[in-house]
Each structure stands twice: as structure tokens, then as C-alpha cells.
Amino acid sequence: MYSYMRSRNKVCIGDYLLCHAAFVLPAAFACYKTDGDLKKLKGNTAYLSRMIDANIEDCRAIRSAGHTILPKEDTDFESAAYRKTCLRFFKLICATSLGKICASDHAMNAVDEMSALDRDLRRFFEEVGADDPVWQALEREAGKYLQ
């Protein structure tokens, strides 16, 4: 997948897009779970941790399929430091209007786009035999929004 985008000595945009989707979609799932009101998840560390778990599952699959984890700062995605950074970010977007601006407004107004992205990632993960039970659970909880 995306092999046509690889070029020598350059960042592969396909790798970046896979990694970006693996981070963004759990946030979209959270928006759909809360009907766009991320403040409902404020303080719900268990759910926010599941978002991070889903991201990590998918980064493993992306790496196992031979893709590079991008940006380079995220290559240590299984570390405690990565989890801590992600948790802080997710807490911030759930506790402030930043979540509405950065995540909710986009997810709630781009359901077709997020659904297509989810379908494409699902297909990719099935092709590479990814083990992603947390991702699948968050996907189910997104409910009626994903098509």
C-alpha cells in the first residue's frame, strides 16, 4: 500500500498518512461516542488510555507491514513517555475548547471522510493481519456515525 509514493532519501507521505490516521481516528471515535462533546470524556482516563492503546496497536501493524513510523519522534510509540504525552494531549482536548476546534468540529462535519478513512484502514489492517481488539471496540462504540 502506498508503495508508489516511496522515493529514495525522502519521507514517504504514505507512511505519514497511515500514522496520522492511526492517531486521528481514535479521536474521531471519541467524538462520535460523545455526539461531538468531548468534555463528556474529561477525566475519563480509562477511555483516553484505550484511545492510546488503539493507536499503539495500529502503529505496531504499520511497522510490521514494513512502513516507517512518522514523524520520527513517534518511533518509540510503545514507551511510557509516548503514552504520557498522548494522555496529556487527549486530556487537553477533552477539557478545553481546543477539542471542539481541533477534533469535534472536523469529525462531526466530516463523517463521510472519517468513515472512508476508517474503512481504508480496516482493509489495510485486515491485509496485514493486525491484532487490534481495542481499535475495533472503539469503532463499535462510535456507533451510528461510521458508515
Predicted ranges, named:
Residues 1-70:
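Internal alpha-helical scaffold of NAD(P)-dependent oxidoreductase catalytic cores
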Residues 56, 63-147:
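NAD(P)-dependent Rossmann-like dehydrogenase/reductase catalytic/cofactor-binding core
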